[in-house]
Amino acid sequence: SRRQASDVYKRQGIDGSSLGLTWAVPFAGILLSIALCPLFLPHFWHKNFGKVAVFWALCCAVPLCAVLGFSVGTDAIVHVLLADYVPFIIFVGSLFVVAGGIHVRGSFVGRPIVNVAFLGLGAVLANFMGTTGAAMLLIRPLIEANAGRTRKMQTFIFFIFLVANVGGALTPLGDPPLFLGFLKGVGFFWTAEHLMLPWLLCSGVLLFIYFLIDSACFKKDVADGFKAPAETKAFAIEGGINVLLLAGIIGAVLYSGFSRSGIEFTFLNVHFALESIVRDLCFLALAGLSLMLTAKATREANHFTWDPILEVAKLFFGIFVCIVPVLEMLRAGHDGAFASLVALVTNADGSFNNTFFFWLTGSLSAFLDNAPTYLAFFNLAGGDPAVLMTTDAQTLMAISMGSVFMGAVTYIGNAPNFMTVAICNERGVKMPSFFGYMLWSVGILFPVFFLMDMVFLT
């Protein structure tokens, strides 16, 4: 029956149903390190966060090799690094380099209406250049616009909500889970057709809430003596060649999604499609061209440094390794350690519970990589795109909304979240701690998500 959860994909060599919850300890460890060390051991963390990430990666990799066998363990680690981590870093790194070569010049002043325009524009652009591309393009001019303001933390929190996550819900280009769904057979325009109303409602409500909060903060800033500088600089975009290079990155993503050569290469037991190799080589070439063709003064105007992308690369190395057994347990479905959670998505009569699909996919996406989480629940819902796009369209909506929208709940829910925070910290913008951010996200986003659930899924 299509209403029965399908067999979930198992990576060759690892049976997720045989793994207990203790295998999740390294993943919990790296999450707690990211959350607590900056609070209680800031100096140690700043100097050693890369070593901490490697430590937790070893805490996962060594037991995998010792308990499951050396070849099984190394195959699993090599697979996640070559098939997932390296392409991920190449993609976000290329966007970071290219977007960092575009300097938007102008006398923008961080008034509430200007900030709302930035956030709204970013939410739209995220669907065409991805959440990472839109975030990296707009974060620097937004920081410049708000440079003179004292109370501005809320602007960058909502930037993560809207530009780095919710905004990218309309196309497969917007967010990795939707692109993965596209590769599995979901129509390119299906997401725009079915998620347009949820996107409009969620984005509209968040922009309205932000406007109210920022207006109150702006009045206090003015009362404390903030004066908007005279708007004298003419609007201009420096490093325009990078706009073309950014279009090239988008084109490479589309090529890898639409092309089906059937040609594969195998390296260290990992299979690579020709399209994926060409795509990643294009990313590297375009990033290299950006570094060669962009004037040094343009990057200096953006205060461009390598620190944010290096921080992401180091921490996500540990996250990607530690996540291996957790995802295998999730992929094991009803036979794995998360069986009690998985059982919630199916009602007693065999029908799908879309509310639980939404909240479970979303809650796990807030802490795990949202792309494989999307895939796991896509498979639990039957895995047939023809059925999920029609008869069970509401279920696919729930999975898509959960994986994209709830990436905003934590700093690690989506790559641009962490990159945005890293750039803000580097530029002297005070951001909340890991748990401090979650107070904002849970307090603001969850009521909006409950509204989305009631309107579209029940």
Outline where the language-model segments fall.
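Short, small-residue-biased leader/transition segments that mark boundaries at the very start
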Residues: 2-9
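Transmembrane alpha-helix boundary signature
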Residues: 10, 42-43, 62-84, 96-110, ...
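Hydrophobic mid-bilayer segments of alpha-helices in multi-pass membrane transport proteins
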Residues: 22-34, 48-65, 85-95, 120, ...
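Membrane-interfacial helix-loop connectors
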Residues: 63-65, 126, 136-151, 155-157, ...
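Juxtamembrane and boundary regions of transmembrane helices in multi-pass small-molecule transporters
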Residues: 151, 170-171, 180, 189-237, ...
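Core mid-bundle transmembrane helix pairs that form the ion/substrate translocation pathway
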Residues: 191-293
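Transmembrane helical segments that form the transport core of multi-pass membrane transport proteins
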Residues: 246-376
